[in-house]
Amino acid sequence: MAWSSLLLTLLAHCTGSWAQSVLTQPPSVSGAPGQRVTISCTGSSSNIGAGYVVHWYQQLPGTAPKLLIYGNSNRPSGVPDQFSGSKSGTSASLAITGLQSEDEADYYCKAWDNSLNA
């Protein structure tokens, strides 16, 4: 059986123009159906490393971005457990297990300073 490769395109997302803090993501990640892929999000000591929380969004073609992970590793209601998030040091990652064709999308990471909510 031939496996068609999936391509997950990624776009870097800024934490906010006032902060001028940039997060770096790879331009693309690919995997075969059923596989596990990990998408990295690299920040710095002024954002992720400073304790900012990381959120992940999925944008399917022709649709608005959907929140996948909030607060580093929490899934909103309705998001399947094939998606998981983690954070370590100045980087974060989104893991997708059991890759499916419908997972082909743009994925964004965002770092947020929770102290702004206080």
Swiss-Prot record:
Q: Which domain of life is it from?
A: Eukaryota
Question: Cross-referenced PROSITE patterns, in alphabetical order?
Answer: IG_LIKE (PS50835)
One GO term of the biological process aspect: adaptive immune response
* Chain residue ranges for the region called Framework-3: 74-109
Chain segments carrying region Complementarity-determining-1: 45-53
Q: A Gene Ontology CC term for this entry?
A: immunoglobulin complex
Chain coiled-coil ranges: none
**Residues annotated as region Framework-1?**
20-44
Q: Which UniProt keywords apply?
A: Adaptive immunity, Cell membrane, Disulfide bond, Immunity, Immunoglobulin, Immunoglobulin domain, Membrane, Secreted, Signal
| Chief location | secreted
The UniProt record lists the keyword Metal-binding: no
According to the record, the residues making up region (Framework-2) are 54-70
Q: Which Gene3D superfamilies match?
A: Immunoglobulins
Q: Does the keyword Disulfide bond apply?
A: yes
Q: Provide the protein's localization.
A: Secreted; Cell membrane
The Ig-like domain is annotated at 20-118
Query: Which interval of the chain is the signal sequence?
Result: 1-19
Which portions of the sequence form the region Complementarity-determining-3?
110-118
Annotated Pfam families: V-set
Instruction: Please give the residue ranges the record annotates as the region Complementarity-determining-2.
Output: 71-73
Q: Which cysteines are joined by disulfide bonds?
A: C41-C109
Q: What does this protein do?
A: Probable non-functional open reading frame (ORF) of V region of the variable domain of immunoglobulin light chains. Non-functional ORF generally cannot participate in the synthesis of a productive immunoglobulin chain due to altered V-(D)-J or switch recombination and/or splicing site (at mRNA level) and/or conserved amino acid change (protein level). Immunoglobulins, also known as antibodies, are membrane-bound or secreted glycoproteins produced by B lymphocytes.
Q: What assembly does the database describe for this protein?
A: Immunoglobulins are composed of two identical heavy chains and two identical light chains; disulfide-linked.
Please identify the protein, giving its name as recorded: Probable non-functional immunoglobulin lambda variable 1-50
State the organism's lineage: Eukaryota, Metazoa, Chordata, Craniata, Vertebrata
Gene that this sequence comes from: IGLV1-50
